[in-house]
Amino acid sequence: MTRTVFCSYLKKEAPGLAFQLIPGALGKRIFDNISQEAWSEWQKKQTMLINEKKLKLMNAEDRKIIEDAMIGYLFENKEVDIEGYTPEK
């Protein structure tokens, strides 16, 4: 049976992640409070952010930029700033 969570991003009950994707307290928070649907939406934004800003995941500063954007997007209702991107209406 699928595990459900009250998703902080979607503000509704939804199927949760199958397992904790990120280690530590942040990973636990995501596992407990973010749905699979919201995580998939974040992954799309993350890919766009990495590509647009030419971030390198080996660089600690770039990983911090991604982590801050992820927390803002998933928990604080902040949109990811991606230059040149216009969302579909």
Swiss-Prot record:
GO terms for molecular function: iron ion binding. SUPFAM superfamilies: YggX-like. InterPro entries: Fe_traffick_prot_YggX (IPR007457), Fe_traffick_prot_YggX_sf (IPR036766). Keywords: Iron. GO terms for biological process: cellular response to oxidative stress. The keyword Iron applies. The keyword Isomerase does not apply. One of its GO terms (cellular component) is cytosol. Belongs to the Fe(2+)-trafficking protein family. This is Probable Fe(2+)-trafficking protein. It comes from Psychromonas ingrahamii (strain DSM 17664 / CCUG 51855 / 37). The lineage of its organism: Bacteria, Pseudomonadati, Pseudomonadota, Gammaproteobacteria, Alteromonadales.
